Design a protein with these regions (language model features):
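Bacterial N-terminal signal peptides that target proteins for export
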Residues: 1-8
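C-terminal motif of bacterial Sec signal peptides marking the signal peptidase cleavage site
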Residues: 15-18
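Bacterial signal peptide processing site
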Residues: 20-22
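N-terminal secretory signal peptides
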Residues: 25-83
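Compact, glycine-rich, soluble single-domain proteins
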Residues: 57, 61-118
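Beta-strand/loop substructures that line and gate deep hydrophobic ligand-binding cavities in soluble
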Residues: 115-143
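C-terminal partner/receptor-binding element of secreted or periplasmic proteins
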Residues: 133-163
């Protein structure tokens, strides 16, 4: 009778040991995925940090879009007794462009409104934003549906700070 009692724990241990070597599936997040910034684009600004933020806000508004928020990460860090480089995220968009996309693919609401980070490191000011093709990747939205809206926002950012 002792033999069957020993076999069950050994079998369970073998199964658990086998599970430890199961490869990661596509649905599981990679430990390095959050570290991968290849989904972003950046433009070196020819303006100061504050001027870059101001120019982007004005350009967005001039195109009829709304600036929903400007998040000052440096100020938030300072309030917590921490220090960091200047970094502001401008959150912007227009329901006219975003709503049809969210109706077609409700989960796309996680990608909107659009955002642009302005940061300064080593004396260099950059505008960093998500690549449009990567934003729509894996969604039911085709590039043709955003090339005259989301892609135009990329062009606006580039022209506003880089030209």
């Amino acid at each position: 009778m002792k033999m069957p009692r020993i076999l069950l724990p050994l079998f369970a241990a073998a199964v658990l040991a086998g599970c430890a070597h199961v490869p990661q599936t596509a649905s599981e997040p990679s430990a390095n995925k959050g570290q991968d910034m290849s989904y972003t684009q950046s433009v070196v600004s020819k303006y100061s940090f504050d001027e870059t933020v101001s120019r982007l806000e004005h350009a967005v508004k001039a195109k009829g879009m709304t600036v929903f928020a400007v998040i000052d990460h440096q100020a938030a860090a300072k309030q917590s007794g921490l220090s960091m480089q200047p970094a502001k995220v401008i959150v912007f968009g227009t329901p006219k462009a975003g709503t049809p996309l969210m109706v077609k693919a409700p989960e796309f609401a996680l990608q909107l409104p659009l955002k642009v980070l302005v940061t300064e490191t080593g004396g260099e000011v950059k505008a960093v934003f998500n690549d449009t093709r990567q934003l729509i990747r894996g969604s039911r939205i085709g590039y043709g549906e955003v090339e005259n809206t989301l892609t135009n926002a990329e062009t606006l950012i580039r022209k506003t700070v880089g030209e």
